[in-house]
């Protein structure tokens, strides 16, 4: 949690030289460890988020996790008059492309993009690793809840989107 706050602080200091110190403190203080913990719990609840796991089930696997993350980003966007652009990035990886790719897989990243109000070509891109795995990298059916294997990072990313969506930045 401290590392996450440090990264958020450094990010905000770097992109927002025009923002007041008070506004930066407001942004940082609005980060909620309870929301982050709730999001980690939700991500763990998908059982496994292995790259090769189920993409159809509404409650289990990488597909369910991706849909939930996308829905969270869309809720955040709706709360800020669509200040976030929510997108999917697809990449087909063929079987045999690596030691742990035992079947063709469509890898999908979920992105939330907050454009600068001055220059729309400048933006903050929020995304993170979604997947999790257990010791056997080719076991994509058994539970691998991964609270500390990408769930915490993705939960931090969702929280960053929640917090940053309340502000508009002038990335000159």
What is each PLM-predicted segment?
Residues 1-20:
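Bacterial Sec-dependent N-terminal signal peptides
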Residues 3, 90, 114-116, 128-130:
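Short, flexible loop/turn elements at secondary-structure junctions
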Residues 20-27, 32-42, 58-72, 110, ...:
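Stable alpha-helical elements in mature extracytoplasmic
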Residues 22-31, 49-62, 96-101, 139-150:
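Second-shell loop/turn segments in exported
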Residues 38-115:
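A non-catalytic alpha/beta surface segment that caps or lines the substrate-entry region
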Residues 79-84, 120, 168-172:
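Short helix-terminating capping/connector loops at secondary-structure junctions
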Residues 112, 126-172:
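Alpha-helical metal-binding/catalytic segments enriched in His/Glu/Asp
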Residues 116-123:
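Proline/glycine-enriched tight loop/beta-turn segments at coil->beta junctions
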């Amino acid at each position: 949690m401290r590392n996450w706050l440090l990264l958020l602080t450094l990010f905000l200091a770097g992109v927002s030289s025009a923002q007041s110190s008070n506004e930066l403190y407001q942004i940082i203080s609005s980060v909620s460890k309870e929301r982050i913990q709730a999001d980690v719990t939700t991500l763990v609840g998908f059982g496994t988020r292995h790259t090769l796991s189920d993409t159809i089930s509404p409650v289990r696997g990488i597909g369910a996790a991706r849909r939930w993350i996308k829905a969270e980003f869309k809720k955040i966007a709706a709360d800020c008059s669509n200040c976030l652009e929510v997108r999917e990035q697809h990449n087909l990886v063929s079987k045999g492309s690596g030691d742990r790719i035992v079947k063709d897989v469509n890898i999908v990243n979920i992105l939330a993009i907050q454009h600068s109000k001055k220059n729309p070509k400048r933006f903050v891109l929020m995304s993170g690793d979604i997947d999790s795995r257990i010791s056997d990298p080719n076991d994509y059916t058994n539970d691998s809840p991964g609270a500390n294997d990408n769930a915490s990072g993705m939960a931090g990313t969702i929280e960053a989107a929640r917090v940053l969506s309340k502000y508009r930045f002038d990335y000159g």
